[in-house]
């Protein structure tokens, strides 16, 4: 996770944003989320909708390792901006 933070975002906001991204990626890779994880996504629906548009577009049958690497690259690009 990003320890450097982003200008204008609190550590809690960064945590929520990153957790939403991770949960969405897990769901996209076919993982079953727990009830508490699904509730977290419902609670932060606004963050979910903004993150969905930023997720890398990959086919569902793509290997999990490739999806994680794409996610890592997008995280690195986000930090550079």
Curated annotation (Swiss-Prot):
Phosphoserine modifications at: 59
GO molecular function: armadillo repeat domain binding; beta-catenin binding; transcription coactivator binding; transcription regulator inhibitor activity
Compartment list: Cytoplasm; Nucleus
Gene3D superfamilies listed in its UniProt record: Beta-catenin-interacting ICAT
GO annotation terms (biological process): anterior/posterior pattern specification; branching involved in ureteric bud morphogenesis; negative regulation of canonical Wnt signaling pathway; negative regulation of mesenchymal cell proliferation; negative regulation of protein-containing complex assembly; negative regulation of smooth muscle cell proliferation; negative regulation of transcription by RNA polymerase II; negative regulation of transcription initiation by RNA polymerase II
Keywords per UniProt: Cytoplasm, Nucleus, Phosphoprotein, Wnt signaling pathway
GO CC field: beta-catenin destruction complex; beta-catenin-ICAT complex; cytoplasm; cytosol; nucleus
Classification via InterPro entries: ICAT_dom (IPR009428), ICAT_sf (IPR036911)
Keyword match Repeat: no
Tissue specificity: Highly expressed in heart, brain, liver and skeletal muscle. Detected at low levels in kidney, testis and lung.
Functional description taken from the UniProt entry: Prevents the interaction between CTNNB1 and TCF family members, and acts as a negative regulator of the Wnt signaling pathway.
Assembly description: Binds CTNNB1.
Family: Belongs to the CTNNBIP1 family.
Protein name: Beta-catenin-interacting protein 1
Protein's organism: Mus musculus (Mouse)
Gene that produces this protein: Ctnnbip1
């Amino acid at each position: 996770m990003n320890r450097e933070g982003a200008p204008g975002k609190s550590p809690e906001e960064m945590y929520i944003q990153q957790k939403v991204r991770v949960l969405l990626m897990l769901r996209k890779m076919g993982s079953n989320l727990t009830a508490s994880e699904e509730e977290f996504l419902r609670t932060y629906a606004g963050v979910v909708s903004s993150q969905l548009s930023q997720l890398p577009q990959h086919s569902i049958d793509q290997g999990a390792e490739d999806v994680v690497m794409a996610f890592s690259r997008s995280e690195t690009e986000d930090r550079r901006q």
